[in-house]
């Protein structure tokens, strides 16, 4: 079943329930399979024209209700919306602006009195520029004559990409080290197959944000050795900047050399180490260095591999209980430190957090509300007088939260019954029971009468 938002009797919300034929998808607007709602060209006194029947295997246009058509937003007669119907040739995509295949709308270089110039024909297999309407061209945002938009047309050589800033292939715009009065210095020529730095215009260089002379931007040019990546902070390959354990008067200690092929820790500057945020002496930052065994990941909280920090069930006077050892290949619960368990937010004794441990059967997911697999909490159909209770339960008996799901079926979070849903209208305000809308029986018996 589905809910239909139009074509209904306002005094009878029952028409929201539209029965779905077997294996077919209902339209959420009409309740009829293979139909769509058309938002234009309809009789305002007759919403029935929303029902447009779809031919087999073809998609309807949501604006026109006709397959293989599109709505054109320009070049149309405002008194005749019928011109929205542009027939699409087989296998070709219509332009949403012009209604003509293989055309595009050009936002510049056109006669404002003649929208016909929107129709720019594309050669076979080539993409038109949305700015110029010419294939293999691009619009250049600088170095152009503001009185002559024609200079937007920069011709692209075969197989090469134009720079959107300069209109010249193999060039880039440099944001520093240039003469403000001469934008021509934006043109930095790229050597073959190498990428230019957007900051310096020189291949194989990078800009360093520290350890430089503020009066000499030339020190931005740090040459990169072959095949190695420069550090954006230091300009030296195989180094990293360390944010702790350094002399604030000597930025040189930012240079931590990395062994070949090994990644440095950004906190410690030592490979295969991590910074531990607890269990450390605040007067000795050296305890940040926790060595990781080969190929194993350290916990950022404990510095021990395959452990996790548990936020409950611990002695506040002893942080050591944060160390919960993980069994092989199994994930620990961050709340309990036990594998295949979950923390339940209700049905617990506030003086005994131990009841958070709910054991999960093999391969089944526990409900975070109830701690029982195949159950859900129901958030409606409750007694409005029981304010302390969040859902459909007896304040003295939380057990009624447990709604058992049949095998392999999903429970409704509103009703706790499979194959039902809650309807937000058409109900007796004094009787919330009418929220239970039952799914058709034949939908739950697949292949019972398929031969029919």
Swiss-Prot record:
Judging by the UniProt lineage, the source's domain of life is: Eukaryota
Q: Region (Disordered): which ranges? A: 1-452
Q: Which residues form a coiled coil?
A: none
List, as start-end ranges, the regions of compositional bias called Polar residues: 29-41, 95-111, 129-144, 163-176, 197-212, 231-245, 265-280, 299-314, 333-347, 376-394, 412-426
Report biased composition (Basic and acidic residues) as residue ranges: 177-193, 439-452
Q: Name it.
A: Uncharacterized protein FLJ40521
């Amino acid at each position: 079943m589905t809910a239909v938002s139009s074509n209904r009797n306002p005094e009878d919300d029952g028409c929201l329930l539209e029965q779905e034929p077997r294996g077919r998808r209902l339209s959420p607007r009409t309740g009829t399979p293979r139909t769509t709602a058309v938002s234009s060209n309809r009789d305002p006194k007759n919403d029935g024209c929303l029902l447009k029947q779809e031919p087999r295997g073809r998609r309807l246009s949501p604006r026109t209700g006709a397959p293989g058509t599109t709505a054109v937003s320009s070049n149309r007669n405002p008194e005749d919306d019928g011109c929205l119907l542009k027939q699409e040739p087989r296998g070709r995509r219509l332009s949403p602006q012009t209604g003509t295949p293989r055309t595009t709308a050009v936002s510049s270089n056109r006669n404002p009195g003649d929208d016909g110039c929107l129709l720019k024909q594309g050669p076979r297999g080539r993409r038109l520029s949305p700015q110029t309407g010419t294939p293999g061209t691009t619009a250049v945002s600088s170095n152009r004559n503001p009185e002559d938009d024609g200079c937007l047309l920069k011709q692209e050589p075969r197989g090469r990409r134009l720079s959107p800033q300069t209109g010249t292939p193999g060039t880039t715009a440099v944001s520093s080290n240039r003469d403000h009065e001469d934008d021509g210095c934006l043109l930095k020529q790229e050597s073959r197959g190498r990428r230019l730095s957007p900051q310096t215009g020189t291949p194989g260089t990078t800009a360093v944000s520290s350890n430089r002379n503020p009066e000499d931007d030339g020190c931005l040019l740090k040459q990169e050795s072959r095949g190695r990546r420069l550090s954006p902070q230091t300009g030296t390959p195989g180094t990293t900047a360390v944010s702790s354990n350094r002399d604030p008067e000597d930025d040189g200690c930012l240079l931590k050399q990395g062994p070949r092929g090994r990644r440095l820790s950004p906190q410690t500057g030592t490979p295969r180490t991590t910074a531990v945020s607890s269990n450390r002496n605040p007067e000795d930052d050296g305890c940040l260095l926790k060595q990781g065994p080969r190929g194993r990941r350290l916990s950022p909280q404990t510095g021990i591999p395959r452990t996790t920090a548990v936020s409950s069930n611990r002695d506040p006077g002893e942080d050591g209980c944060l160390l919960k050892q993980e069994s092989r290949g199994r994930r620990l619960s961050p709340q309990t430190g036990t594998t295949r368990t979950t923390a339940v937010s209700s049905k617990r004794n506030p003086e005994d957090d131990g009841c958070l441990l709910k054991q999960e059967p093999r391969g089944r997911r526990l409900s975070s509300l109830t701690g029982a697999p195949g159950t859900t909490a129901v958030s409606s159909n409750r007694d409005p007088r029981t304010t302390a209770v969040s859902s459909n339960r007896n304040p003295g008996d939380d057990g009624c939260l447990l709604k058992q799901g049949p095998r392999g079926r999903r429970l409704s979070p509103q009703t706790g019954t499979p194959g039902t849903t809650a309807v937000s209208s058409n109900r007796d305000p004094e009787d919330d029971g009418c929220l239970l809308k039952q799914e058709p029986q034949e939908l739950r018996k697949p292949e019972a009468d398929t031969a029919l």
